[in-house]
């Protein structure tokens, strides 16, 4: 398996030329990198004007590997070839490196780049990417992979320290300014200004106190005090190391790489409508930074959010008065770590009464609104406390818990709520404090614990009786000033006290069922299943030419081909496919065919858009300006891989998928809308669907389009 690494953008608050002067001091050897034994220049080229300088070195490394492995391999040192291409005119340095030793067994490629910061020409950006592919290594492939990744990540951590070390060294030598490259023709005319600049730089070096030099200045301390400090931004919306540390926390190099790679994949497939970085990080943490697993559950969650309009729940849904009066839970300040604190007096809550009065779906929706509010409060606290806060603390008081709370429908509703929250809000619970647990609690815990993720379970702290008042209790996690009054604290807690829900508020099963349907059908999106040989099609009748058909769909599972057809004939009434084996008529499995099998393309109907292949996880928005009235058919068709793939060997994942029946099933979630010609005034912005479901978890929204003669399709 190929291991990949992608670094965030590292920002040095120094001019490019000064960074280059520091970088060159790493050769031919670097005492700060013990494994870097030495290097020899193999080839060197300089342009006549001095703007281009290309140098190729052969580097000798002493890899920290087991002695037995070195003996088996028959080598003591590993050799790499490094090619540095400096363009002083463009102020860029590109570094390419690959292994020379065991190149037929192990393939290592690295690319680094130094460029000028896009918002401050006196700052320098650094990026790094690498790949490792071990073909074979005497049966020690796994061991070599671990050693290589360990060595590489340790050197990544030292990279910034090394540059700053040589910057301090230059400072101690009085070198604080390196002039920019200029064409030879104007060098003579600018000698005077250049010399004055050097004098000014020398005077700047004198200003720095000698004591400060002895103590050693950090990179930030050495930056010019007069230099402007805009918000650190990077080209193409890339993440920089300072931003990650400030808003996301301390991550290892491999964790940073996973975040950046998953983020890049989302940008490619969702075209800017991606979740915020902290939300992506939550899914990665929930799957131990396994990119494939995190991507799978994140795509499922994004589809779920879009289908049920969860992004707008705080603005569009008001909790019923019964919840406001009898749901004994609410937000209450924050804990010692700055996490928002949610208090739930479960023992005082009439779970049976709430379920009978509201139904399971209303309770679920209320819990979702609590989680959405928690995400918002985490963002606010991150700004207030100046450090990353991505989770909240929940305090559950169980005083009053009894067998009434073990009512079977109530427990069933609780288990479903846990399942939905675990799937869509991973790593949002920082700590759960369970206080005054009664004897009946172990029974409830036995029912609930199997549905709780192991990582979440480790965050639970359970106190029986008044144990929470002793050592290791509540005071270790919450300041004394904000402990609620019902726990013998000094702070008034405005959480409702709960109590029994009056039976007059109970509703019949039919009323609750209708209410549940109403809650979860409040979505503009529809779901459909697509099978091999059984596409899903919808019919749109256009009366006036020049109308605009818009669409917005997500490919939830599998790969599909999207087509648009026009016909003057009316298709037969829509009929569900009768392939019972696929359970097409089940909820979320709608499948309809409209094009009769006897119809011929070009005679009975025509294609008005080029087929668009859409991969799993992609979000597609687009529109088509109709040329003729009649019947338009939007079709989602199963996409089969060509028999002769580009690669000689198929991927293992593809082989395994082909063995499963479900591999011939795709799922899409779509919304369509028709804009009348009188409402369309020729503006391209009018082509965008007004109901396109953009997630509020998104950090940015951009678009890219693929235009045809009369349509615009954007992914």
Swiss-Prot record:
InterPro entries: CRAL-TRIO_dom, CRAL-TRIO_dom_sf, CRAL/TRIO_N_dom, CRAL/TRIO_N_dom_sf, GOLD_dom, GOLD_dom_sf, PRELI/MSF1_dom, SEC14/CRAL-TRIO_domain
Modification type Phosphothreonine: residues: 234
Residue ranges of domain PRELI/MSF1 in the record: 1-175
Annotated ranges, domain GOLD: 521-674
GO terms, biological process: choline transport; innate immune response; negative regulation of cytoplasmic pattern recognition receptor signaling pathway; negative regulation of RIG-I signaling pathway
Keywords, sorted A to Z: Cytoplasm, Golgi apparatus, Immunity, Innate immunity, Phosphoprotein, Signal transduction inhibitor
Pfam families, sorted: CRAL_TRIO (PF00650), CRAL_TRIO_N (PF03765), PRELI (PF04707)
All copies of domain CRAL-TRIO, residue ranges: 319-495
Modification Phosphoserine, positions: 586
Molecular-function GO terms, alphabetical: protein sequestering activity; RIG-I binding
Tissue: Ubiquitous.
Region (Required for interaction and inhibitory function toward RIGI): 1-510
Superkingdom of the source species: Eukaryota
GO cellular component entries: cytoplasm; cytosol; Golgi apparatus; nucleoplasm
Subcellular location, record wording: Cytoplasm; Golgi apparatus
Function text: May play a role in innate immunity by inhibiting the antiviral RIG-I signaling pathway. In this pathway, functions as a negative regulator of RIGI, the cytoplasmic sensor of viral nucleic acids. Prevents the interaction of RIGI with MAVS/IPS1, an important step in signal propagation. May also regulate the SLC18A3 and SLC5A7 cholinergic transporters.
Stored PANTHER family: SEC14 RELATED PROTEIN (PTHR23324), SEC14-LIKE PROTEIN 1 (PTHR23324:SF51)
Subunit structure: Interacts with RIGI (via tandem CARD domain); the interaction is direct. Interacts (via GOLD domain) with SLC18A3; the interaction is direct. Interacts with SLC5A7 (via GOLD domain); the interaction is direct.
Protein name (record): SEC14-like protein 1
Gene that specifies this protein: SEC14L1
């Amino acid at each position: 398996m190929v291991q990949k690494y992608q670094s965030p953008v590292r920002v040095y608050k120094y001019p490019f030329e000064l960074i280059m002067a520091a970088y060159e001091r790493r050769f031919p050897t670097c005492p700060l990198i013990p494994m870097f034994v030495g290097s020899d220049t193999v080839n060197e080229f300089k342009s006549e004007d001095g703007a281009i300088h290309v140098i190729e070195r052969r580097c000798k490394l002493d890899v920290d590997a087991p002695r037995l492995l070195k003996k088996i391999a028959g080598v003591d040192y590993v050799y790499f070839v490094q090619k540095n291409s400096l363009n002083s005119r463009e102020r860029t340095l590109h570094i390419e490196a690959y292994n020379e030793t065991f190149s037929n067994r192990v393939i290592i490629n690295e690319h680094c780049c130094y460029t000028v910061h896009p918002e401050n020409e006196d700052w320098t950006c650094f990026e790094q990417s690498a790949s490792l592919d071990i073909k074979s290594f005497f049966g020690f492939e796994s061991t070599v992979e671990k050693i290589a990744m360990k060595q590489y990540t340790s050197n990544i951590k030292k990279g910034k320290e090394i540059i700053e070390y040589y910057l301090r060294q230059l400072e101690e030598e009085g070198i604080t300014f390196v002039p920019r490259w200029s064409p030879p023709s104007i060098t003579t005319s600018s000698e005077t200004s250049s010399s004055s600049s050097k004098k000014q730089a020398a005077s700047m070096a004198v200003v720095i106190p000698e004591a400060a030099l002895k103590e050693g200045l950090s990179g930030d301390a050495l930056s010019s005090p007069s230099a402007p400090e805009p918000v650190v931004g990077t080209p193409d919306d890339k993440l920089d190391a300072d931003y990650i540390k400030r808003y996301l926390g301390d991550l290892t190099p491999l964790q940073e790489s996973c975040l950046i790679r998953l983020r890049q994949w989302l940008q490619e497939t969702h075209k800017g409508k991606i979740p915020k970085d902290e939300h992506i990080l939550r899914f990665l943490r929930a799957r131990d930074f396994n990119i494939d697993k995190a991507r799978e559950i994140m795509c499922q969650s994004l589809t779920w959010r879009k289908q049920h309009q969860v992004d707008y729940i705080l603005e569009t849904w008001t909790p019923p008065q019964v919840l406001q009066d009898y749901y004994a839970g609410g937000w209450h300040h924050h804990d010692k770590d700055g996490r928002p604190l949610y208090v739930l007096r479960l023992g005082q809550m009439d779970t049976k009464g709430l379920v009978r009065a509201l139904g399971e779906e209303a309770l679920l929706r209320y819990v979702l609104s609590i989680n959405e509010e928690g995400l918002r409060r985490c963002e606010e606290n991150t700004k207030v406390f100046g450090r990353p806060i991505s989770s909240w603390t929940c305090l559950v008081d169980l005083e009053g818990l009894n067998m009434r709370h073990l009512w079977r429908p109530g427990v069933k509703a609780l288990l479903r709520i846990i399942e939905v929250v675990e799937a869509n809000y991973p790593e949002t619970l920082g700590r759960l404090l369970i206080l005054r647990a009664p004897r009946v609690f172990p029974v409830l815990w036995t029912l609930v614990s199997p549905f709780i993720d192991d990582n979440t379970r480790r965050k639970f702290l359970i106190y029986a009786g008044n144990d929470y008042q002793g050592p290791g209790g509540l005071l270790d996690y919450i300041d004394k000033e904000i402990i609620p009054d019902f726990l013998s604290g000094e702070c008034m807690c405005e959480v409702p006290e709960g109590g029994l829900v009056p039976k007059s508020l109970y509703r019949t099963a039919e009323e609750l069922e209708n209410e549940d349907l109403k809650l979860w059908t409040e979505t503009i999106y529809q779901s459909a299943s697509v099978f091999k040989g059984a596409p899903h099609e919808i019919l749109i009748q256009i009366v006036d030419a020049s109308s605009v058909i818009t669409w917005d769909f997500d490919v939830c599972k599998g790969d599909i081909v999207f087509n648009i057809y026009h016909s003057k004939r009316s298709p037969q009434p829509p009929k569900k496919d009768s392939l019972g084996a696929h359970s097409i008529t089940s909820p979320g499995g709608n499948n309809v065919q409209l094009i009769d099998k006897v119809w011929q393309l070009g005679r009975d109907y025509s294609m008005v858009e080029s087929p668009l292949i859409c991969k799993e996880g992609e979000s597609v928005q687009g529109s088509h300006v109709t040329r003729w009235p009649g019947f338009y058919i939007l079709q989602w068709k199963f996409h089969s891989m060509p028999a002769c793939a580009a690669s000689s060997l198929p991927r293992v994942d593809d082989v395994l998928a082909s063995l499963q029946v479900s591999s011939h099933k795709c799922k899409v979630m779509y919304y369509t809308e028709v804009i009348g010609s009188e409402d369309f005034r020729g503006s391209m912005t009018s082509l965008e669907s007004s109901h396109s479901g953009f997630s509020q978890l998104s950090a940015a929204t951009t678009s890219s389009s693929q235009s045809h003669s009369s349509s615009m399709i954007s992914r």
